[in-house]
Amino acid sequence: MDKQLENSDLPAAVHGFVDGWQGRNAEKVEGLFAADAVVTDEGHTYRGRDEINGWVRNGINLFSTTLTFLGAREAEGMVGASYRLEGDFPGGVVALEYQFRLDESGQIATLDFAEAAA
């Protein structure tokens, strides 16, 4: 069963990822991932620090976006934070759920993206 979360309830790594990405601070974002982390984005999977650092560095400056928090949930060890993204990317507006799993030390172990629930 999902537990609903407020923005203030989100773990530090989730806030760090969103704030770091919005601030285009690649080093901050990279430091949030565990050594064996896995990110899946747009059909591509990135494993480990080297691949994830490449994903961050290639993506962090691609588009200018503004995020609006829509809601969050926790379910079976996954923290899903939903945002409305508006920016200069194709389509201009999208609602996404950032799906985080954290390790015991609070670092990001996995990150996936899905369409946010309506």
Language-model segments: what does each one mean?
Residues 30, 40-41, 68, 111:
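Short, hydrophobic secondary-structure boundary micro-motifs
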Residues 1-27, 31:
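Short, low-complexity N-terminal intrinsically disordered segments enriched in polar/charged residues
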Residues 2-4, 53-118:
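A beta-strand edge to alpha-helix "cap/lid" segment located at domain peripheries
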Residues 37-38, 116:
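A broad detector of the eukaryotic-type serine/threonine protein kinase catalytic domain
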Residues 38-47:
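A short gly/proline-enriched turn/hairpin at secondary-structure junctions
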Residues 34:
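Helix-to-beta-strand junctions that scaffold the AdoMet/dcAdoMet cofactor pocket
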